[in-house]
Regions:
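Glycine-rich loop(s) and the adjacent beta-strand/alpha-helix scaffold that form part
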Residues: 460, 467-531, 723
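A glycine-rich dinucleotide-binding beta-alpha-beta segment and adjacent secondary-structure elements
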Residues: 445, 623-707
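Core beta-strand elements of the Rossmann-like FAD/NAD(P) dinucleotide-binding domain
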Residues: 289-292, 460-471, 689
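Conserved N-terminal/central alpha/beta ligand/cofactor-binding core
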Residues: 325, 329-436, 440-442, 548-562, ...
């Protein structure tokens, strides 16, 4: 018999049950809280005090009055005395809530454990969340700002525990008979991912998983969506729910696993019968030799640009990528691409010059940039925009960004994040051109012969590779996710949140250095001023470029929001608590698609009025209202007497509702790296080009100097990815 069983979240059933019990008891039921423009339960989150002691990711809270003291009429007698436990997945792993109910029917003790949560964020929030459970006498707690996922996990786990205390545990699912693994049929489970609901539908026969369908269209494009695309095949291959999470997409992966487990339990499975992930025996690795014209290490923006252009030029190309998907740090780019004298600027009446682009970049980099590299990037930028047009990736929306004199940063028409947009387009071209991409394969060494690069050594889970090539292009990104390297060059950044993708660990820099490459500006590491600390999510510079402002915890502006990133970061760190709020309105939200991801992720706070917003973020309402009134007048006058802001003032902030995101600086870009010349050739410690070795993107140094201007990273990867490709093609033809 074919079963159709959809597992919905237990919460819905629990609320219905509590309502029924309360009605029978004659109790008054309050209307449930409604989410407004963000994840449920985050609208009025409490902020953890900066002076609060660090948590060991475990906390117990109990009321001051003796246990079993009387509780309010709203909760008295609702729950049965005893101790009850529930669990749910947080940001890093399982979170467990244990609640003790006294004889009077109220919660008398709350204990939360979550050893996998980020210590300074989710872990720090746990004591506050435990106290909130006691104060609320329910699972409907406000949560902690910046610890969205941990807060939601506590709500879900507490809901489970209180369900048990209410005597409303779910009916035990049927079990497969005999030595069968499943009851044949099709089953669906649901869970909450990074951007919304994730559904997993499985079709099973008595002893096998026959089909897996995953739906998670709201997950982050080219990060979570890769987990949605790839984990179904891995689950089918393993014939088990216990497969490794996709690196870099842990939240989405965990949501898929929760939904899958629900579906399999409904199918009669005993989950303890499946081996844990990674328990399969490892055999001896095989050895394989490959040959190609050009081998490219890294499938981020620079690597994919180089691969597409080299293939278009008639060369055979292999890309080696250590992650299970393409994109690298390019996926994280949310702003746009700087380019001067483009046809889009001309069509929109924007006056800009290559020379001004160069000067802005040099000034932003504190004049330690290599001017020759900057000049080439600026001169090539319009041509790069034309090439993006030709491959189906136009960037027609032109606006301001920090450090730019003119409207120069080019973005997708709908204002969506440029990185995910370009990665999707690059990937489509890679597939259409049939370029070989070796996923989950890590390059370990550059092979040389008589001083020239002649290929690479690499390895995957089960194979060692020798890849012979006429030319090698390094496009592995920087080292923003290698804390050891970060701390080595900048000890004061230890423990700082990073926006970098998981694979950005400096591999290419180390490989190049091993064959004699020189390094430049290696200690220049950039902080981005607008990073949501709980999720490491970067708030695109376009939000400020389109008119948003920054305020401190007093509700006051404190800087020109569109100064260079290092200047704005320094200004934030000087504020009480070393954080700020970015404030914007509905009109700005409507014009910038990237904001929808912030809303769906639950990191925004929304208020119907400025005063309402101020109360929710614990800022003085009168002060914030005065700040907005002044700012709107400055926009009308096109003059900012407080901080001399002259750009991003086309739109005021007067359209309700209003939004805020709590932000602080985070590691964003490593400006230093392998030294290259204007042909993207890698330079050795003696100042000579290493034959056959080229590099592009964040793996290189010299372009950005002491600070990278917003929009220049994408310009760098497309321009120098193109130049590296052209130079490698020419080298192959010698």
């Amino acid at each position: 018999m074919k079963n159709e069983l959809t597992k919905k979240r237990f919460f819905t059933g629990l609320i219905a049950g509590i309502v029924m019990i309360a009605l029978l008891a004659g109790l008054e039921i309050a209307e449930p809280k409604k989410a407004t423009g963000q994840a449920a339960g985050t609208a009025a989150e409490t902020t953890v005090s900066e002076g609060a002691p660090a948590s060991e990711a475990a906390a117990t809270a109990a009321p001051a009055e003796p246990a079993n003291a009387s509780v309010s009429a709203d909760t008295e007698g609702t729950f049965t005395a005893g101790t009850y436990t529930g669990s749910a997945n947080g940001f890093g792993g399982p979170v467990e809530v244990t609640l003790t109910v006294g004889d009077a029917g109220g919660i008398t003790n709350a204990e939360i454990t979550g050893s996998s949560e980020t210590p300074d964020i989710g872990g720090k929030a746990i004591p506050t969340l435990a106290q909130q459970l006691l104060d609320a006498q329910s699972a409907e707690i406000d949560g902690v700002s910046g610890a969205t996922f941990t807060s939601q996990a506590v709500r879900d786990a507490a809901t489970q525990a209180l369900g048990k205390a209410s005597g409303m545990e779910t009916m035990e699912a049927p079990k497969a008979e005999g030595d069968n693994l499943f009851i044949p049929g099709t089953y669906t489970g649901s869970s909450t991912g990074f951007g919304g609901e994730v559904d997993v539908t499985v079709t099973v026969s008595e002893k096998s998983i026959d089909d897996v369908q995953i739906e998670g269209s709201h997950e982050t494009e080219n990060i979570g969506t890769f987990a949605v695309e790839m984990l179904d095949d891995r689950i089918l291959e393993a014939q088990s729910p216990n497969v490794d999470a996709l690196t870099g997409a842990t939240v989405t992966s965990n949501a898929i696993f929760r939904a899958l487990n629900d579906a399999l339990v409904a199918a009669g499975a005993d989950l303890t019968k499946f081996p844990a992930a990674g328990e399969e025996e490892e055999g001896l690795k095989s050895y394989e030799e490959l040959s190609t014209d050009i081998v490219i290490v890294g499938a981020g923006g620079a690597g994919m640009t180089a691969a597409i252009k080299a293939t278009q030029a008639g060369k055979d190309v292999i890309i080696v990528e250590k992650m299970p998907y393409v994109g690298g740090n390019t996926t994280k780019a949310t702003g746009g691409m700087n380019a001067a004298e483009t046809h889009y600027q001309a069509e929109q009446g924007i006056e800009d010059t290559v020379e001004q682009f160069v000067e802005d970049t040099m000034k932003g980099g504190h004049d330690i940039n290599d001017r020759s590299l900057v000049t080439v990037m600026a001169e090539y930028s319009a041509k790069a925009i034309d090439w993006l047009d030709s491959i189906g990736a136009p960037l027609p929306k032109v606006s301001f960004s920090g450090g730019a004199t003119n409207r120069r940063i080019h973005a997708p028409e709908d204002g969506s994040g440029v990185g995910a947009y370009l990665v999707t387009a690059f990937r489509k071209n890679i597939d259409e051109l049939g370029i070989k991409v070796m996923y989950e394969t890590k390059a370990t060494d550059i092979m040389t012969l008589d001083g020239a690069a002649v290929g690479i050594m690499a390895e995957s889970k089960d194979t060692y590779y020798t890849i012979h090539a006429k030319a090698v292009i390094l496009a592995t990104g920087g080292f923003g996710n290698n804390e050891g390297m970060i701390v080595h060059y900048k000890p004061d950044l230890k423990g700082t949140v990073t926006t970098s993708a998981p694979g950005i660990t400096g591999d290419g820099i180390l490989m190049a250095e091993a064959v004699g490459a020189d390094l430049v500006d290696i200690d220049q590491i950039q902080l981005h001023p607008t990073v949501e600390q709980g999720t490491s999510m970067l708030i695109t510079e376009s939000v400020r470029g389109d008119g948003a402002i920054l305020v401190n915890q007093e509700g006051k502006r404190f800087t020109n929001e569109l100064l260079t990133r290092d200047a704005v970061s320094a200004a934030e760190l000087a504020q009480p608590g070393s954080y700020a709020y970015i404030i914007f309105d509905q009109k700005l939200r409507d014009g910038l698609k990237a904001i929808e991801k912030y809303v769906s992720t639950g990191i925004t706070v929304q208020g119907d009025t400025i005063e309402d917003l101020a109360k929710q973020i614990d800022v003085d309402p009168a002060t914030l209202a005065d700040t907005l009134t002044k700012w709107n007048q400055y926009v009308a006058d096109q003059k900012d007497p407080d901080f001399d802001r002259t750009t991003g003032m086309e739109n005021d902030l007067s359209t309700a509702p209003y939004y805020a995101i709590k932000i602080a600086p985070g590691i964003h870009h490593t400006m230093g790296g392998v030294k290259i010349n204007t042909s993207a050739e890698v330079i050795d410690i003696n100042g000579n080009a290493i034959p056959g070795l080229f590099a592009a993107g964040e793996v290189t140094g010299g372009v950005h100097g002491g600070n990278r201007i917003g929009g220049n990273a994408v310009a760098d990867i497309v321009v120098f990815g193109s130049i590296a490709s052209e130079s490698a093609v020419a080298y192959c033809d010698k």
